[in-house]
Swiss-Prot record:
One of its GO terms (cellular component) is cytosol. This is DNA ligase. InterPro entries: DisA/LigA_HHH, DNA_ligase, DNA_ligase_AS, DNA_ligase_CS, DNAligase_adenylation, DNAligase_N, NA-bd_OB-fold, NAD_DNA_ligase_OB. Coiled coil: none annotated. One of its GO terms (molecular function) is DNA ligase (NAD+) activity.
Length: 628
């Protein structure tokens, strides 16, 4: 049944907003608002809706790539040719249709070959070389203009500072981290009470920062998957200068094909994936995909599909590109692996903003190479929509290869012992009555933001995170400890910049069944004369450094609901001072670029609460500069 025009317009507007928000989170904030499957479904629905309407705005996400570069943080880099995305297919039938359509460009009797490559779950990077020297590295950005990350990429060991290729040459590729390296860093981070959510976000955070960590950057790898040049032989964004071999450096004759070009790049010390394969027919492509699927866990880094490209550069040029993706390449996305386990219980957690989220306690089971024992259930509506009962057998998968997700219950396996879950009416931490923040909200929240210790611990952990005030050792366990610090009662957040080494040494608390005193040296000591660990000094030093953080990071540290890095930077750029933001009226906040009504009201209301104003004033009196 067709949509009325008004409904279709509203649906397109909503889908566009959701996709742009997801892109901002993914490309600028190094996080994910949804799984790859959910994102792909939104893009597919938007294309269908625009097709039904018979019109696409030229700025629609269906026709654009990535998100605009954050030029207030990074210098702009204009790509020689657009750094495009890829169209996706989700079944072998869809891939075969693309294959048949694409190979029609090959003349009768001329063999049409394809290159198959792993689709690595990393961050797209463009490297520019001038007469053999690396002169810049850039992110994708919006496809036309990226962010200059040269200083960070110089630390990546697999990226050569010089290559034996003349002229101005751009190498397109993927920056990523191998699983064992990521696990090693997370183990070290665990010892420092800091861990990273997933490999892709780790890489994005490392290369998109103004304060690079050399050790982290040295753990990153890079594989080339394309190239482009200012002049010479052009092929739909993957170019090759016809005089390259005549210029010396490498003797191998290069043909105008992707696969042979990769060999040439490899000889020039540019890393190329050894899993790349040349296929002469669809049967070979299908066999390659099946072999990778069966041996996926043997691949030492996260992948989420296979990229299939036509090999001939000349034929790539003939096929060309849309504004978003080349016509000569496509990404086949792996279906998420799933398995069945038992839903042992449903429990709830309280977040730093008071949101109460149910999660599934599962019978532990191996899935995609790791043990899964928990999965988020989002809210009571999701539990009802999926018809979940405690005791059910459920099918689970890892959304985007990372986050465990409960897909559905298996009601045919029920024996009558299953129990209906009901959301609690009281906060499991402080006992406050749970309620929606406004009429019609699905989520329940604990309104006791000032005194709920779990919320306080969550806010402290967030304040200490790398993207906010970056306070060493202020992660989950120590945030929990500080929230229970007797000296400050329930005001550890307010008194954060007063914390001393003596306060840390005095910390002794029970955490997950174990007595902990993380800032006190082990061994002989007299009561009242315990020696602090080096980590205690590091934490106090980083608290002192945090006082000089930019205004936008302090806005994040205030834990204002709906405020992320992009909106915090927009507020800081527009108003320039914390005083101006505190005193701003809603209509003034609405003038800020990219701020909608929900965020404007949230910011306005936050500063109307007396204890929050006290928080800001106390931090300022304790030396926090708020960007000044």
């Amino acid at each position: 049944m067709p949509h009325p025009d008004g409904d279709l317009d509203r649906r397109i507007e909503l889908l566009t907003a959701q996709i742009i928000a997801a892109r901002k989170a993914y490309y600028q904030e190094n996080t994910s608002l949804m799984s790859d499957v959910e994102y792909d479904a939104l893009e597919h629905e938007l294309k269908d809706a625009e097709h039904a309407k018979g019109f696409s705005d030229r700025n629609s996400p269906s026709l654009t790539v990535g998100i605009a570069a954050q030029l207030n943080l990074f210098e702009p880099v204009k790509h020689i040719e657009p750094m495009l995305s890829l169209d996706n297919v989700f079944s072998l039938d869809q891939l075969h249709s693309w294959y048949e359509k694409t190979k029609k460009i090959c003349p009768e009797g001329d063999q049409c070959t394809f290159v198959c490559e792993l689709k690595i779950d990393g961050v797209g990077v463009s490297l520019r070389y001038a007469n053999g020297y690396l002169i810049s590295a850039a992110t994708r950005g919006d496809g036309a203009i990226g962010e200059d990350i040269t200083q960070n990429m110089l630390y990546v060991p697999s990226i050569p500072p010089r290559i034996a290729l003349p002229g101005i040459f751009e190498i397109r590729g993927e920056a990523f981290i191998k699983r064992d390296e990521f696990d090693r860093i997370n183990q070290l981070s665990l010892e420092r009470s800091k861990q990273f959510a997933n490999p892709r976000n780790f890489v994005s955070g490392c290369i998109r920062t103004k304060t690079p960590n050399m050790r982290y950057l040295e753990s990153i790898s890079f594989y080339a998957h394309g190239f482009t040049q200012v002049y010479g032989y052009t092929s739909g964004g993957m170019n090759l200068h016809s005089d390259i071999t005549a210029s010396g450096g490498v003797k191998t004759e290069i043909e105008h094909g992707m696969f042979s070009a990769y060999s040439r790049l490899s000889e020039c010390k540019i890393p190329v994936n050894s899993y790349n394969r040349l296929c002469t027919n669809f049967s070979e492509i299908e066999s390659y995909i099946e072999n990778i699927r069966l041996n996926r866990q043997c691949v030492p880094y996260a992948i989420d599909g296979i990229v299939v490209k036509i090999d001939s550069l000349q034929k790539q040029a003939l096929l060309g590109s849309t504004t978003k993706a080349p016509r000569w390449a496509v990404a086949y996305k792996f279906p998420s692996e799933s398995t069945v386990t038992r839903l042992l219980d449903i429990e709830v957690s309280v977040g730093r903003t008071g949101r109460v989220t149910p999660y599934a306690v599962l019978q532990p089971i191996q899935l995609d190479g790791s043990e899964v024992s928990r999965a988020t259930l989002h809210n009571q509506k999701v539990i009802g929509d999926k018809d979940l009962l405690i005791g059910d057998y459920v099918r689970i998968r890892k959304a985007g290869d990372i986050v465990p997700e409960v897909l559905c219950a298996l009601p045919e396996k029920r024996d009558g012992s299953e129990v209906l879950f009901k959301m609690p009416s009281l906060c499991p931490s402080c006992g406050a009555e749970l309620m929606p923040s406004k009429l019609g909200d699905i989520d329940l929240r604990c309104p006791n933001m000032q005194s709920c210790l779990v919320q306080l611990a969550g806010r402290l952990e967030y304040i200490g995170s790398r993207g906010v005030l970056d306070i060493a050792y202020l992660a989950e366990e120590n945030a929990y400890a500080l929230s229970h610090l007797r000296k400050f009662g329930k005001s550890a957040e307010v008194q954060l910049f007063k914390i001393t080494i003596d306060d840390l040494v005095a910390l002794e608390f029970m955490y997950k069944g174990n007595m902990r005193s993380p800032f006190r040296k082990k061994g002989d000591s007299f009561p009242g004369f315990e020696e602090p660990t080096k980590s205690a000094q590091d934490m106090v030093d980083s608290i002192e450094r945090a006082k000089r953080s930019p205004l936008w990071k302090f806005l994040l540290a205030l834990n204002i609901r709906h405020i992320g890095p992009a909106s915090a930077k927009a507020l800081a750029d527009h108003f320039g001072s914390i005083e101006s933001i505190i005193n701003a009226k809603i209509d003034e906040l609405l003038k800020v670029r990219s701020l909608g009504e929900t965020i404007a009201i949230s910011v306005h209301d936050w500063f109307r609460d007396p204890w929050r104003v006290e928080l800001v004033n106390t931090w300022r009196s304790d030396g926090a500069l708020f960007g000044h």
